Amino acid sequence: MPNYFFVKLNPPRPTFPGDMTDEERDVMQAHGAYWTEMTRKGFVIVFGPVLEPNSTFGMGVFEAESEERVWELLADDPAKKAGLSHEVHPMRIGAVRGSI
């Protein structure tokens, strides 16, 4: 069975992305393009923003052989290069659509 990892992109401040600067907007566009490419390559199952009442954060689910591989892939994320931080959490999957 494949290994799955929940990845959270921590926002730089609680008001983000509502008050993004032009530079941050450029970074986030590049970030979205990077995650789209990771999805095309089969590493990412799903990704996008989570809209919390007091904050918004990014999330994605990776399929990879190890947590170390996820961190290697995240090193090239433009958001990471711009100084934003990620959290990586291993997941235990109850079921995946299409596999049951």
Tell me what each language-model feature is.
Residues M1-I100:
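Conserved, structured core segments of small domains
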